[in-house]
């Protein structure tokens, strides 16, 4: 190797020096022929003039590492380019595929259509009379979108409102009936805009589905509550008899302890259980022993141990009254609860009732609004639907009356100090504010709704027109009443002046002219009241 390059030539064996001169000349001739043949490249077969050219050819052509690295990098870059181009094409195809699909349920058809094709299958079922006509250079109906409706952006009719939207603003789906109304049970999946999607019934409900378990709870609770109530009444009667017994009978402490007179009197009211029958305490389930002696409850007569008995001191009783834990739970704790409740301020209970009525008003107001919106949705009005709306409105107004009555009870309740009066006044003011806001927000039922007909926008415009006429007529009547009241005021002043001047003949004339004015005012007031009811 020379200058860092590998030299290729014919290797001459070392044993040539041992040969004779004849053999040396012969081998030299053969070696010269081998050297000539060695100028051919062993890799690519290229013939070169000499060994130096062969070495240069090998170094430049076949052993250049930098060129191999560049070729390898070029091949890697070309592979990455081909892969990225293929992925981009695949992404574009997937996007086009997804763009033509709807991310919602289909109608269960067996045609195999998906996306817009499946949505178009319902076009023959749902009415299209309300669709917006197509004109050139239309833009999306969404107020925040200014896309031009074309083949790329799309031009999709909302099946509910009929307006035209782009693909992005019509990617919603709801169930509609054949009349393009909301029908979540028997409707068909149709493509709609966002406003119609969010405007469907129940979308803005925050409570969700409610299943009341009160009836089941009441079924299980009522027997237990009735049993406890009957037990409380029975124990209260026995307690009352015991108190009357000790107040009517003159029993001294000596008679009670030595002559067992108290025991006989108590047994005359409550039958005591036989000691020999009971071997285990019913309260703690322990056997009776010398240290765990038997005792009798004075209210129920059961046999209990001395560790499960409670001693209740009574004013008229010469010795403590022995009762069991069950009687203490059923009677004395109820008495204590009722006593503590009776000590609380009276208007506090009214405030609690106010909260209950308020919650009920919120629930019935929501139910009334839902039923009224369903009634005015454009569907055929049935007698049952109209009755439900009227009943809910009536129930809501009854709750408002109860709410107002409870509020007046709080206001009229006597106060012991200024702080209590200020607290009551704040509660009443808040209740008044809430009641006024609720009544003002209450939507009235249109008076000319008829069973068997549908509520339309024309009916609404007609109602507004009639309402304006009623308001105009009412304003005219009020102006007339004001004029008549001014005349009455002037006539009354004239009567007072005539009385002061003792002109009694003029007084009679003025009084006779005053009566028709009052009758006319009363008649106009009734007409205004009738118009108010008509407006409601």
Curated annotation (Swiss-Prot):
Protein's UniProt name: Vacuolar segregation protein pep7
Binding site for Zn(2+) 2: 281, 284, 305, 308
Residues the entry annotates as binding Zn(2+) 1: 158, 161, 193, 196
Chain ranges of zinc fingers (FYVE-type): 136-201, 275-332
UniProtKB keywords: Metal-binding, Repeat, Zinc, Zinc-finger
GO biological process terms held by the UniProt record: Golgi to vacuole transport; vesicle docking involved in exocytosis; vesicle fusion
Superkingdom to which the source organism belongs: Eukaryota
Bias (Polar residues) ranges: 12-31
Lineage of the species this protein comes from: Eukaryota, Fungi, Dikarya, Ascomycota, Taphrinomycotina
Gene name of the record: pep7
């Amino acid at each position: 190797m020379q200058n860092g390059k590998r030299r290729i030539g014919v290797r001459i064996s070392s044993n040539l020096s041992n040969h004779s001169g004849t053999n040396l000349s012969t081998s030299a001739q053969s070696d010269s022929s081998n050297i000539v043949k060695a100028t051919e490249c062993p890799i690519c077969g290229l013939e070169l003039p000499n060994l130096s050219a062969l070495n240069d050819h090998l170094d430049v052509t076949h052993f250049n590492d930098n060129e191999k690295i560049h070729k390898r990098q070029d091949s890697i870059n070309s592979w990455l380019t081909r892969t990225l181009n293929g992925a981009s094409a695949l992404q574009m195809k997937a996007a086009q595929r997804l763009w033509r699909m709807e991310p919602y349920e289909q109608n269960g058809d067996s045609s195999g259509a998906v996306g817009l094709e499946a949505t178009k299958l319902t076009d023959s079922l749902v009415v299209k009379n309300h669709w917006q006509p197509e004109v050139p250079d239309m833009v999306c109906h969404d107020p925040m979108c200014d896309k031009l409706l074309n083949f790329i952006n799309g031009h999709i009719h909302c099946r509910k409102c009929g307006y035209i939207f782009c693909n992005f603003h019509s990617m919603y789906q709801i169930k509609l009936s054949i009349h393009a109304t909301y029908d979540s049970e028997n409707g068909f999946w149709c493509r709609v805009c966002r406003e119609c999607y969010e405007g469907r019934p129940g979308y803005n409900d925050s409570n969700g589905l409610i299943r009341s378990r009160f009836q089941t709870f009441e079924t299980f609770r009522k027997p237990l509550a009735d049993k406890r109530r009957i037990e409380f009444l029975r124990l209260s009667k026995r307690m009352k008899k015991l108190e009357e017994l000790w107040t009517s009978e003159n029993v001294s402490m000596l008679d009670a302890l030595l002559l067992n007179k108290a025991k006989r009197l108590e047994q005359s009211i409550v039958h005591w259980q036989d000691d020999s029958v009971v071997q285990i305490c019913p309260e703690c389930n322990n056997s009776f022993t010398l240290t765990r002696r038997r005792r009798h409850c004075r209210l129920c007569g059961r046999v209990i141990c001395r560790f499960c008995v409670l001693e209740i001191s009574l004013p008229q009783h010469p010795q403590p009254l022995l009762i069991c834990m069950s009687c203490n739970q059923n009677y004395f704790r109820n008495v204590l609860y009722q006593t503590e409740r009776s000590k609380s301020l009276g208007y506090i209970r009214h405030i609690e009732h106010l909260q209950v009525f308020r919650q009920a008003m919120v629930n019935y107001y929501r139910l009334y609004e839902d039923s009224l919106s369903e009634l005015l949705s454009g569907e055929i009005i049935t007698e049952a639907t109209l009755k439900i709306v009227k009943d809910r409105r009536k129930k809501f107004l009854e709750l408002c009356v109860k709410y107002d009555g409870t509020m007046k009870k709080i206001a009229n309740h006597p106060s012991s100090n200024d702080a209590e009066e200020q607290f009551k006044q704040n509660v009443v003011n808040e209740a008044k504010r809430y009641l006024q806001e609720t009544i003002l927000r209450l939507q009235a039922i249109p008076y000319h709704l008829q069973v068997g007909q549908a509520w339309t926008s024309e009916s609404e415009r007609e109602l507004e027109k009639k309402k304006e006429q009623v308001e105009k007529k009412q304003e005219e009547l009020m102006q007339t009443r004001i004029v008549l009241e001014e005349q009455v005021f002037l006539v009354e002043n004239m009567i007072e002046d005539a009385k002061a001047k003792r002109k009694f003949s003029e007084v009679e004339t003025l009084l006779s002219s005053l009566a028709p004015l009052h009758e006319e005012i009363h008649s106009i007031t009734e007409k205004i009241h009738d118009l108010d009811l008509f407006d409601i």
